[in-house]
Amino acid sequence: MKFSWRNLKRPIFTLAPMEGATDTVFRQIIADCAPPDVYFTEFTNVQGLLSKGNKQVSQRLKYSKKEKPIIAQIWGTDSESFYESAKLISKMGFNGIDINMGCPEKSIVKRGSCAGLIRNPNLAKEIIDKTRQGSKNLPISVKTRLGFTNIELLWIEFLLKQNLDALIIHLRTRKEMSKVPAHWEQAKDIVALRDKISPNTILIGNGDVENVNEGLERVKQTGLDGIMIGRGVFHDPYAFSIDKSLHILTVNEKLSLLKKHLDLFEKIWGEEKSFPPLKRYFKIYVNGFEKASALREKLMETTNINEARIVLNKFTRA
């Protein structure tokens, strides 16, 4: 059956696209622990995707059968590149395309992309239209923020007029980054806007939600269709499980997950990806138990997967 946001059971829980974190390896770990309803890739630059020698860029679009349904998130400023990228993505088995209009990173915003598009609605509309034209009827969504400097519901209203299949809103402005609590008090007004302007657009809220149980409360309070969980999975790989008993892991369970992550990384990427970026995941698994800090320090000193395995095995045998 063709994927449709509207056919998903409510509330919908999605895994956020997070740069340098939610690659296919980590998504598969989450899928085996407690799967979300929808997965997103890391954001992929449209011009990079179309360039020759795009191996590193296309790695971002790698996924497995267990990561379904999966949405390809793309970003950039050139509308023709969005059109061509959408054509390419439509042949790759993805269930939808999401346009990043929310990343607050300074160098990207300076180029007028991602959150920079909040200040350029004409280009934002052109990009949405071109992506839709190239996508061969794949669902189109946008992930954005409440505004650039201040909360701007006119921006949300504008997006709701673009006939999107889904709109994911990080409930902070670009200026706020993640430095203040998310503005969940705005969600009800946004739901009312959606009901008035575009009743068929699915609304997903994002910001400060650690797990499904917190998300259920937010949905109850706001009337949103679903919740996107991001950093919560770094604290708890079982963030998408409603079973609270699964959120408390033993030391052996945590370290077994790390070993699984190492094995999967090696199997999927081999020599394609270097070892150092893998170290950012150590803190996810090596925390909250006696001598965790010392173990993490030793792991950070390793230079390859085999060395990391040796350190882990020594710790578990001690």
Predicted regions and their residues:
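Flavin-dependent oxidoreductase catalytic cores
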Residues: 1-318
